[in-house]
Regions:
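PLP-dependent amino-acid enzyme catalytic core
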Residues: 1-485
Length: 485
């Protein structure tokens, strides 16, 4: 299995999985994808169903990873997934249970049973194990430079804290996270964790990460890697839970006609991009529903064909803050597939048109015309009032308390349900404890606090303020990161 950049030219070399694991962004500014997607046949899915039932989620995940990873021994891969997906790190032994939402014709895939109560744990726990394994094998070290709108940061830091050969520099938008999210990150005082509050919004943080990655000399000197969803291994981990979701919703003997559709609360397009990849592999997913909040860049594209990232000033602060993103970094992967995997055409859009015009328009193309039939995508939006109403309604009618992002998903799911046949699953993003103020506003009461989080907002915190400057960030890395630690 070899990997290619979305901006590849005719002479761009392919890479191995272990190389791109540590590298993150490709040297040409593109994102890595497999040269070809492996396929999942009906018999493959039957075998994975047996493995999931008899051996558990970790063993099933190892089976899927083995389709993409041929430079890590199969026995080692099984051990890696067994360490990543275990209790008590995950509070439910099923890791990803799927339940019917009472009183509706919807299902919920529960992705937030990990150590930080967010779906990001599903990828980060695996990424931490993969990083440590590969760095130990190479005798190397890595400086992770990442950006978070709320959940990625804490998930990454909990997965990477105290790991050999790893330092973490995590950028957050100052004042844009909930008190719980800030406490989860800033109360980690481990010597290999550096929390940074940037004077800007999430997209500014993400741009700083890209600027660091595009400085080849600095990146090489400081061994810079990525945990944001620009890292292919993140998406690969997420592909696994879409397979598990399909297996848990369908019955024994299900075949390619047994379509399951999913609704994915979306900001950076990573989660739903994993659904797209699983669908390309042959997993019988029907419609892929992109649910956005008021920062509706993705919804605009799927409705109109125009991709128009917003400026920092135009990115709204909402009550589903982890989706307050107006430059979807993973979107390039999908556009690469949409354009027939043409690296030159993809580069022309993302490196040239966006820089020159601030948008690109595919509305008149045959690719956009066939978007739903070929790739299954539709979209919808949700507002503050919508998510408050959905949180209150779902608690009253179903006895289930949603976090604001999952509420966006359920709101959109109800709106599109008449268009979709067969099971429809909303992919949960987090537990409501992370968004207490919004839950209180919606329901009149605070969310329950799991025992492991009691008192977290009263702990000592450490964070470094930073101007929105790549040079200032480089100076901070030089000052705070211990090479080889």
């Amino acid at each position: 299995m070899r990997y290619i950049s979305t901006r590849r030219g005719p002479n761009t070399p392919t890479r191995s999985f272990s190389d791109i694991l540590l590298e993150g962004l490709a040297p040409d500014g593109g994102l890595y994808l497999p040269e070809e997607y492996p396929t999942l046949s009906v018999s493959d899915l039957d075998e994975l169903r047996i493995v999931l039932r008899e051996e558990g989620y970790a063993a099933m995940a190892a089976g899927i990873l083995s389709l993409f990873v041929d430079d890590i021994d199969a026995t080692d891969l099984c051990a890696i997934t067994a360490r990543a997906y275990s209790t008590p790190a995950f509070s439910d032994p099923q890791i990803v249970p799927v339940t019917a939402l009472e009183g509706t014709d919807l299902h919920i895939a529960h992705l937030s049973n990990g150590p930080t109560a967010a779906f990001k744990d599903m990828a980060m726990q695996l990424l931490g194990e993969l990083f440590e394994y590969e760095l130990t094998r190479r005798g190397d070290w890595l400086t992770i430079v990442g950006a978070t709108s709320g959940d990625t940061g804490s998930s990454a830091e909990y997965a990477l804290r105290d790991r050999r050969g790893l330092s973490v520099v995590m950028l957050t938008p100052a004042g844009r996270m909930t008190p719980f999210q800030r406490a989860q990150m800033f109360s980690l005082l481990d010597s290999n964790i550096v929390n940074v509050a940037v004077d800007g919004v999430f997209d500014d943080c993400q741009d700083l990460v890209k600027a660091i990655n595009m400085d080849a000399d600095f990146k090489a000197t400081w061994h810079v890697g990525a945990v944001n969803s620009i890292n292919w291994a993140r998406l690969l981990a997420q592909v696994c839970y879409y397979v598990a979701t399909w297996l848990r919703v369908t019955e024994e003997g299900a075949d390619a006609s047994s379509k399951v559709s999913v609704v994915v609360p979306s900001g950076n397009f990573g989660n739903v991009c994993a659904a797209h990849i699983a669908r390309q592999m042959g997993l019988p997913l029907g419609t892929l529903v992109v649910a956005t909040n008021e920062n509706d860049v993705l919804d605009e594209f799927f409705r109109t064909g125009v991709y128009r990232p917003r400026s920092s000033v135009d990115t709204l602060a909402t009550s589903s803050p982890s989706m307050d993103i107006s430059k979807a970094s993973n979107f390039e992967r999908f556009i690469f597939d949409l354009l027939g995997r043409d690296g030159d055409a993809t580069r022309a859009l993302f490196d040239e048109a966006l820089t020159r015009d601030g948008y690109f328009d595919l509305s008149g193309t045959p690719e956009f015309a066939s978007l739903r039939d070929t790739y299954g995508f539709i979209s919808g939006t949700s507002t503050h009032a919508d998510r408050l109403a959905e949180i209150a309604r779902t608690e009253k009618e179903s006895g289930y308390l949603l976090d604001p992002h999952t509420a966006d998903g359920v709101h959109v799911a109800r709106a599109v349900r008449p268009q979709i046949e067969g099971p429809l699953v909303v992919m949960e993003t987090a537990l409501p404890v992370k968004f207490a103020d919004t839950i209180l506003e919606a329901t009149g009461h605070l969310p329950p606090v799991p025992e492991r989080f009691v008192g977290i907002e009263g702990r000592e915190e450490r964070v470094t303020p930073l101007a929105n400057s790549a040079e200032d960030l480089k100076a901070l890395i030089r000052e705070r990161v211990r090479p080889g630690a």
